[in-house]
Structure formats: C-alpha cells, structure tokens
C-alpha cells in the first residue's frame, strides 16, 4: 500500500475554518534518522527494534515577515466518520484492538516560536514497544499555526464561537519491526440508528482488527427485511480508508424516513487494495 501511504504522508495543507483567504507562510519537513527505510518518501518509515529509544525531529520553516507560533503534536492515526485516515485528533477514542497508540510512544506535543524568515526544530523522543509487535504502528506529526491576532477572528455572538484561519500540515510516521505484512481483517459490529448529514440513518460499525491500513476501499451496503430479497436501502462509497486497529460508523441514509419495526439484515461488500470482505448482520 505504499502508493496510498505516500499520498497520505507527504506533508500537505489542511484549511480548517477559512474566514478569508490568506497566504501560507510556513512549511514543515522531516529530518530522517538512520533507521529511515527510504529518504525519498516524504514521511517517516522507521524500522525499530524492541525497546529502541531515539530522537525524531521536525523542521518548521517560517517564510513570512512576522514571527509565528506553531503546535507540533504526535497523534495516533484513526479512521474518522468519513472513512478517512485521520491524524489530526489529539485525544481520540482508541479501538480496543489497538495495543500501541503512537501518541503513547512519543514525548508530548510542543509549541515552537519561529522568528520571521527563520526555522526551528521540534525534537521528540520515540520509545518503541519493549515487546515485539506485528504489522504497522501508524501516526503522524500534526503541525498547526497558533493564531494570536484577534483581528483575524470572526466571532459569532449568537453561538459564542469563533472561526480562525488555521493551516495545518501532517508528517506521517510508520513504525515496523520486520518486512512481514499482516493481512487486515474487517468485522461488522453494532448496528444502530443515527444521523448522517442531518438525515436519519442506519450506522454500521466497521472494524479493522489488524495492524495494517487499508486503502482504495469500495463499500456497497444494502438493507433488506430479514429473510427477504427486496433491497430497501442502498449505499455505495468509493476511495475510503482505514487505519490499523481502528473502526468507524458507515452510514446508510434513510432519506428522513422512519425504519418500521421489525427484523432487518444488512450486507456490506468491501473491495480494497488489501482484500475483499462480505459482512452481514441481522438487527
């Protein structure tokens, strides 16, 4: 899945809550340690030994005319509710199968003050698991600018919230102990009613129980009355992803129609770059 990982891990900009257009005046880059497998990847791909301790550094370059502050946070990769691998959450709810969250292997987040037209380096200590592990530990450094200028904030007095221009970068980190791959395994867990984009929906929790990510997922879900062949609701999505040892709720829109009382069955077919699965559950 290196093509997918390369796409995910190359430092990129995320515009969260745009109030007005603004030029990005900083960039980030990795400093590769000796155990980097390939220095042309654009992300950290580190082969580690049990109990290994090392430093991992991130360079922040300020290309602007003003000083700035950035937060650099080592976050664990999860799967968000859009079916995308997400590195931006500092305190997510971890899947029960995740044995080694990346965040817990790294020293805490740092705040850097970077003078105008200068660079600064954030250095973190990585403590690899003392025991051997299979597959991949996935995380990333989430770098976001700290905004001090209140002029750049738009305050919504009715809701009591503020919107601020914030541009963020992600530098991915992949930890492995061997070249042996672990095949992902998908499981269908709870089925429950909920909301999807403000509409009533059925939410089906899909779990990846193994230490390997999945990309290029095509998900085709159908709901029927239990024991019947007529499809009542159908949902299909492409280009979804799942982080190692993670889960998310896949939603099937009910078009704001109530689901009548009774027994139903859901079948979810998943095709991906790591395999195929057919999941089924009565509810």
Predicted regions and their residues:
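Beta-sheet-dominated interaction scaffolds and their linkers
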Residues: 30-64, 68, 111, 185-197
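Intrinsically disordered, low-complexity Pro/Gly/Ser/Thr-rich segments with frequent PxxP/GP/PP motifs
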Residues: 91-132, 224-260
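Terminal connector regions
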Residues: 66-97, 119-122, 127-179, 257-283
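Short, solvent-exposed loop/turn segments enriched in Ser/Thr/Gly
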Residues: 51-57, 120-122, 134-140, 198-202
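Proline/serine/threonine-rich low-complexity linkers at boundaries of modular beta-sandwich domains
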Residues: 21-38, 175-185
């Amino acid at each position: 899945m290196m093509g997918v990982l390369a796409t995910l891990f190359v430092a990129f900009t995320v515009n969260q809550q745009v109030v007005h257009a603004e030029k990005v005046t900083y960039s980030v880059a990795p400093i590769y340690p000796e155990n980097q497998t390939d220095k042309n990847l654009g992300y950290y791909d580190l082969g580690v030994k049990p109990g290994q301790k090392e430093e991992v550094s991130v360079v922040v370059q300020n290309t602007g005319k003003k000083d700035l502050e950035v937060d650099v946070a080592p976050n664990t990769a999860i799967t968000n509710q859009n079916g995308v691998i997400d590195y931006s959450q500092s305190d997510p709810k971890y899947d029960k199968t995740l044995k080694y969250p990346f965040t817990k292997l790294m020293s805490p987040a740092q705040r850097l003050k970077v003078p105008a037209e200068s660079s600064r380096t954030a250095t973190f200590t990585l403590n690899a698991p003392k025991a051997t592990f299979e597959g991949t530990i996935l995380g990333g450094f989430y770098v976001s600018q700290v905004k001090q200028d209140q002029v750049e904030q738009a305050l919504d007095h009715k809701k009591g919230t503020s919107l601020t221009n914030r541009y963020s970068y992600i530098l991915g980190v992949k930890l492995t102990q061997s070249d042996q791959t672990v095949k992902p395994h998908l499981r269908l867990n709870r089925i429950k009613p909920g909301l999807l984009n403000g509409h009533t929906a059925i939410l089906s929790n899909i779990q990846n129980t193994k230490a390997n990510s999945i990309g290029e997922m095509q998900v085709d879900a159908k709901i029927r009355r239990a024991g019947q062949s007529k499809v009542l609701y159908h949902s299909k999505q492409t280009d979804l992803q799942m982080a190692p040892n993670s889960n998310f709720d896949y939603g099937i829109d009910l078009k704001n129609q109530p689901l009548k009382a009774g027994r139903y069955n859901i079948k979810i077919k998943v095709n991906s770059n790591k395999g195929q699965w057919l999941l089924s559950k009565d509810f």
